């Protein structure tokens, strides 16, 4: 069971565990090559699930998004915000339209 490790609600854990795949560690060790096309993106959004079993490693990304002027939202739920808070997640996404 991996779901408990990222703060998934107990009711959602079987679904998350069934859908989870091994995480590619290369994302931490390999350099990312960007084309520059990201500069043309006009709207930026970061959604942070704040309820985790320990200090969130994602909080720094939430804070960076806020500092950069992104639309940054903190939801009181686990890592899989779309499972824990589907209606709030939809509201946040629709706010960009």
Regions found by a protein language model. Give the residues of each.
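Conserved loop-alpha-helix segment in the C-terminal half of the alpha/beta-hydrolase fold
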Residues: 50-77, 83, 88, 95-96
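Residues in flexible loops and secondary-structure boundaries
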Residues: 24, 36, 80-83, 91
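Alpha/beta-hydrolase
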Residues: 1-60, 70
